[in-house]
Amino acid sequence: MAQVDLDLLPLTGIDKVTFYKRDEITTDLICCELLFGDTTWSFHEELVGWDSLIEHLTRLPGFLADWFAQVSQPPFENREIVAFTRR
């Protein structure tokens, strides 16, 4: 199983954090995309280290604390939320 390596994700390099969910027929899968310059890294909640990734991202200045409530409801409906944008 893949694992999140926070050493490769310095907060100073993150330009944008976007959360969205994918309909997996019987469940929703919460996903996250991190923009680093011209590179996008994608993660999902089933990865080992997801909780550590979220804790890491909350240290970004102005990070949207209630992103989960906004992206998770209503169930089985496409939702996308930008939780951080570097200005």
Which stretches of residues belong to each language-model region?
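Acidic, Ser/Thr- and proline-rich intrinsically disordered linker/docking segments
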Residues: 15-87
